Amino acid sequence: MTPEDFYMALKELGFDLSQKQKDQFQRYFELLVEWNEKINLTAITDKDEVFLKHFYDSLAPVLQGHIKNQSIQLLDIGAGAGFPSLPIKILCPNLDVTIIDSLNRRITFLNFLSDELGLSGVHFYHGRAEDFGQDKAFRAQFDIVTARAVARMQVLSELTIPFLKVGGQLIALKAAAADQELVDARNALNVLFAKPILNENYKLPNGDGRNITIIDKKKETPNKYPRRAGIPNKKPL
């Protein structure tokens, strides 16, 4: 998917990018490849592949109507090089975006990237989701939490649901169908007072399969969740 194909595909879906937004995506690509020489950000560095498998892929929640350009709080857990939240931020500049990532080098990249792209309303924190999830400044503060290929739902739910306000949504993006994951996560979601409202398979323009799962938070998360760092992965709910 060339940049021109990318812009045309977005336009056909009702998103006519400004020159500034096009420049932001172009500069994002350049910095991603440049910094990838120094720190491991991605295995995908071919321009057409980045525009398809990172940028277009990240925008699925917006293109499908689940995230709109409004002034709400979005948290991205384990965003790595900023996916999916920073492409979403470029397309929806009114969003307030927070990223938590466990590698400080990636946070350094994200700070530099956001300055270069002229993004405002973005905040980056180094640390573990389990620790931030027990911090009152972060717990139950977000309308949406995104996670792209972070962990299976049984684990991911404990790492993300505590950050949501009641009525907020977890939007999880994956490469494979999530049916079995949701079966395995049934107990975790019950314990966390959360409920799946969407589990949908779709295809990228090149035919690659993808999945989007949306989970609603129904009630306040019990205080003991998330458990200490590492425990959700070792002993899933």
Curated annotation (Swiss-Prot):
Annotated protein name in UniProt: Ribosomal RNA small subunit methyltransferase G
**Principal location:** cytoplasm
Q: Which GO terms describe its molecular function?
A: rRNA (guanine-N7-)-methyltransferase activity
Q: Name one GO cellular component term.
A: cytosol
Please list the residues that bind S-adenosyl-L-methionine.
Answer: G78, F83, A129, E130, R148
Location comes to: Cytoplasm
Family note = Belongs to the methyltransferase superfamily. RNA methyltransferase RsmG family.
- Known role: Specifically methylates the N7 position of a guanine in 16S rRNA.
Q: What is the lineage of its organism?
A: Bacteria, Bacillati, Bacillota, Bacilli, Lactobacillales
Q: Which Pfam families match?
A: GidB (PF02527)
Q: What are the alphabetically sorted keywords of the record? A: Cytoplasm, Methyltransferase, rRNA processing, S-adenosyl-L-methionine, Transferase
The primary gene name is rsmG
What PANTHER family would the database entry show?
S-ADENOSYL-L-METHIONINE-DEPENDENT METHYLTRANSFERASES SUPERFAMILY PROTEIN
Please state the Enzyme Commission number of this protein. Answer: 2.1.1.-
Q: Which EC class heads this enzyme's classification?
A: transferase
Signal sequence bounds: none
Record HAMAP family: 16SrRNA_methyltr_G
